Amino acid sequence: MAEPTMDSLLARINELAHKNKTDGLTDEETAERDHLRKQYLKLFRESFRSQVEMMQVYDKAGKEVTPEKVRQIQRDKGLRDD
């Protein structure tokens, strides 16, 4: 089975949220909602971390001021030559 996308997870989470407001959720649906939320947060964090690790920061003078921690991660992943 393919890994669900953030959009598909969010759509189902929203369906369950709407149902919870109108009719309430069964125990199975509550467990599904909790599982979907955890999956969504995991994917969100992975995506955000990847974006931060790929980022380079420059000041107004054009000098790179990327934090050393990020630079080291980039070096470890082979994304930097310096």
From Swiss-Prot:
Annotated Pfam families: DUF896
Subcellular location: Cytoplasm
InterPro entries: DUF896
Main location: cytoplasm
A GO CC annotation given for this chain: cytoplasm
Coiled-coil stretches noted in the UniProt entry, renumbered to this chain: none
Assigned keywords, A-Z: Cytoplasm
Family affiliation: Belongs to the UPF0291 family.
PANTHER family per UniProt: UPF0291 PROTEIN CBO2609/CLC_2481, UPF0291 PROTEIN YNZC
The protein's name: UPF0291 protein LVIS_1359
Species of origin: Levilactobacillus brevis (strain ATCC 367 / BCRC 12310 / CIP 105137 / JCM 1170 / LMG 11437 / NCIMB 947 / NCTC 947)
